[in-house]
């Protein structure tokens, strides 16, 4: 599984959706990035492939960042994926 995670303005919790293949995750990442770059707010409907009944609609102008990573079976004590400024 691959996770596409979004950070939203004024929201401490990220939004994430899962894709079964790398190609699908990269496609969604590119679509979100293009919407962020366009400068024209638009509504985006996102669905999770793991739990297909879960869906969300959000405005592209509220997205601050997007990241893509592979969900692994690491233990609960592992560090969260993403970028870190601390050592």
UniProtKB/Swiss-Prot annotation:
Highest rank taxon of the organism: Bacteria
Q: Which family does it belong to?
A: Belongs to the UPF0367 family.
- InterPro entries membership: UPF0367
What is the organism field in this record? Synechococcus sp. (strain RCC307)
Query: Could you identify this protein by its name?
Result: UPF0367 protein SynRCC307_0258
């Amino acid at each position: 599984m691959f996770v596409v995670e979004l950070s939203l303005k004024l929201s401490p919790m990220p939004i994430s959706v899962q894709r079964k293949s790398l190609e699908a995750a990269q496609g969604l990442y590119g679509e979100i990035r293009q919407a962020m770059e366009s400068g024209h707010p638009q509504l985006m409907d996102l669905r999770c492939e793991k739990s297909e009944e879960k869906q969300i609609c959000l405005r592209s102008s509220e997205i601050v960042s997007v990241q893509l990573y592979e969900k692994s079976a690491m233990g609960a004590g592992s560090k969260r994926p993403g970028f870190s400024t601390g050592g």
